């Protein structure tokens, strides 16, 4: 019972609100076309069609009933001469509206174009009964197209706003909250409206022919900032400016054509902007997905490297230790046999060589410093191991990166860039000084390695000496790696910060 009463109140409110809005728009339309029956085909038609495109089918009888009652009342009051044609036309418009009603809740560019097509079809059907009235049929078609494309998209904007926001009942907790007027948006709308009105009223007569082209400026500006909603709001502002300009009084058809063209421009431009935004969002999602997959691949690679390094260290290390032990036993047991003793010493030396080679391989597979040290300490340890001072290279490390903000992939990548950069400096740069800096800037991690050497060898470009692999790792983490060879070599790395 309570639900039925609530539905009844809703229907009654819908009936009276629609009736009041319909009559007001009919009065405005009558001011423009000066014929009561033709005025019904302008803005009242656009209002009814716009609401029917958005609301559930259960409210269609309310809208049609209210319109028919108003048309009947106007027939009695002012003598509408084509009451049957208006009734038949309104029934015919139900067909395209019913066909696309299932898509009304979708908010993509196809929906805008579908509703635009439905508006055009409904306008044709509404004017179809006027086909046998000669010139009036073209006037009816122009009026329905203009009214439908002017008001129906605005209904879509308001319906989208009302349906996509969470509305809470006004209570004590909400009364004390300040109202967000969004002053910047209001000023922006008002400024564009004033400019549009000035273009209609303030341009000299010799430039008046360019006035219709100026109507596109607010549409483009609002569409760029606010998408399809902005484009449709701009068409409403242009319509108000055109009607208020009073320049159409001697040529009402020109006004209708201007309203039709700018409304069609707003609808198509809004659909295009919406399409671009949807493509951009889809591209961003794919980029984020690829970024996530690349990071997962790096994690998997480092996990495999770590496992392989551990297995090599445990198995080969134990085997080499056993070989050295057995070689020592052979040397002691065959102390009198010089050739056997020499072979034992050779085996021990070869095992030490294998151990050193495996140790270097393990260092490339997985930097052992990162297992026990912080990143800064690991880089300092790396610089000591490379014996930069002994090679005549003065080194300086300045590190201002909070390691708690680094993921494991970032730690390994930064260390490997330092490792590869220092290795290239030692082997190829012929440098006397190297500076390594790391810091955080604007939610990004910055790393710079500079030397005063001869730069990269001719012909190597920026791809050799392991730099390609480093660039791929940095790119996989969403960063960039740049190399410049002016007065030495400068390797710059920038990574997006990840909070751990």
UniProtKB/Swiss-Prot annotation:
Gene Ontology MF terms: ATP binding; phosphoprotein phosphatase activity; phosphorelay sensor kinase activity; protein dimerization activity
Membrane topology (UniProt): Multi-pass membrane protein
Reported effect, residue 313 to E: Lack of autokinase activity
BP terms from Gene Ontology: signal transduction
Transmembrane parts of this sequence: 8-28, 36-56, 80-100, 112-132, 140-160, 185-205, 213-233, 253-273
Keyword Hydrolase attached: yes
PTM statement from Swiss-Prot or TrEMBL: Autophosphorylated.
Protein name as it appears in the record: Signal transduction histidine-protein kinase/phosphatase UhpB
Organism from which the protein derives: Escherichia coli (strain K12)
Entry GO terms, CC: plasma membrane
EC number: 2.7.13.3, 3.1.3.-
SMART domains reported in the protein's UniProt record: HATPase_c
Cytoplasmic side: 274-500
Purpose of the protein: Part of the UhpABC signaling cascade that controls the expression of the hexose phosphate transporter UhpT. UhpB functions as a membrane-associated protein kinase that autophosphorylates in response to interaction with UhpC, and subsequently transfers its phosphate group to the response regulator UhpA. Can also dephosphorylate UhpA.
Occurrences of domain Histidine kinase (ranges): 311-499
Keywords: ATP-binding, Cell inner membrane, Cell membrane, Hydrolase, Kinase, Membrane, Nucleotide-binding, Phosphoprotein, Protein phosphatase, Transferase, Transmembrane, Transmembrane helix, Two-component regulatory system
Pfam families: HATPase_c, HisKA_3, MASE1
Modified residues (Phosphohistidine): 313
Localization terms from the record: Cell inner membrane
Activity control summary: Kinase activity is stimulated by UhpC.
Catalytic activity of the protein: ATP + protein L-histidine = ADP + protein N-phospho-L-histidine
């Amino acid at each position: 019972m309570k639900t039925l009463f609530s539905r009844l109140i809703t229907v009654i409110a819908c009936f009276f609100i629609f009736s009041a809005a319909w009559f007001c728009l009919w009065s405005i339309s009558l001011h423009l076309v000066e014929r009561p029956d033709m005025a019904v085909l302008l803005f009242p038609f656009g209002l009814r069609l716009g609401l029917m495109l958005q609301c559930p089918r259960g409210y269609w009888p309310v809208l049609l009933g209210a319109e028919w009652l108003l048309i009947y009342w106007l027939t009695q009051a002012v003598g509408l001469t084509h009451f049957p044609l208006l009734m038949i036309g309104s029934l015919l418009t139900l067909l395209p509206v019913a066909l696309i009603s299932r898509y009304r809740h979708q908010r993509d560019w196809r929906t805008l174009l579908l509703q635009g097509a439905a508006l055009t079809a409904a306008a044709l059907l509404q004017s179809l009964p006027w086909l046998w009235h000669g010139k009036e049929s073209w006037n009816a078609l122009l009026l329905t197209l203009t009214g439908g494309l002017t008001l129906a998209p605005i209904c879509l904007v308001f319906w989208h706003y009302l349906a996509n926001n969470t509305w809470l009942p006004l209570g004590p907790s909400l009364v004390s909250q300040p109202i967000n007027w969004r002053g910047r948006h209001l000023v922006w709308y008002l400024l564009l409206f004033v400019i549009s009105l000035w273009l209609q009223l303030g341009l000299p007569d010799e430039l008046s022919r360019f006035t219709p082209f100026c109507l596109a400026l607010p549409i483009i500006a609002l569409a760029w900032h606010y998408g399809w909603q902005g484009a449709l709001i701009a068409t409403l502002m242009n319509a108000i400016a055109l009607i208020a300009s009073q320049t159409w009084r001697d040529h009402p058809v020109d006004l209708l054509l201007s309203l039709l063209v700018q409304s069609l421009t707003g609808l198509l431009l809004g659909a295009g902007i919406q399409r671009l935004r949807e493509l951009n969002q889809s591209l961003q999602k794919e980029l984020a997905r690829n970024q996530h997959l690349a990071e997962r691949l790096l994690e998997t690679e480092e996990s495999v490297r770590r496992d392989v390094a551990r297995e090599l260290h445990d198995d080969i290390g134990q085997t080499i230790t056993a070989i050295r032990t057995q070689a020592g036993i052979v040397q002691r047991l065959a102390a009198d046999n010089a050739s056997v003793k020499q072979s034992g010493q050779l085996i021990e030396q070869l095992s030490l060589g294998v151990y050193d080679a495996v140790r270097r391989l393990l260092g490339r597979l997985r930097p052992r410093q990162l297992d026990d040290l912080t990143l800064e300490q690991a880089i300092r340890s790396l610089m000591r191991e490379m014996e930069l001072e002994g090679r005549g290279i003065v080194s300086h490390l300045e590190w201002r990166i909070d390691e708690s903000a680094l993921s494991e992939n970032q730690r390994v990548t930064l260390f490997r860039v330092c490792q590869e950069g220092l290795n290239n400096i030692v082997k190829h740069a012929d440098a006397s000084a190297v500076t390594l800096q790391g810091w955080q800037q604007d939610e990004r991690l910055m790393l710079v390695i500079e030397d005063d050497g001869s730069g990269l060898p001719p012909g190597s470009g920026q791809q050799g000496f392991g730099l390609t692999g480093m660039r791929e790792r940095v790119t996989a983490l969403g960063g960039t790696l740049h190399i410049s060879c002016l007065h030495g070599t400068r390797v710059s790395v920038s990574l997006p910060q990840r909070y751990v």
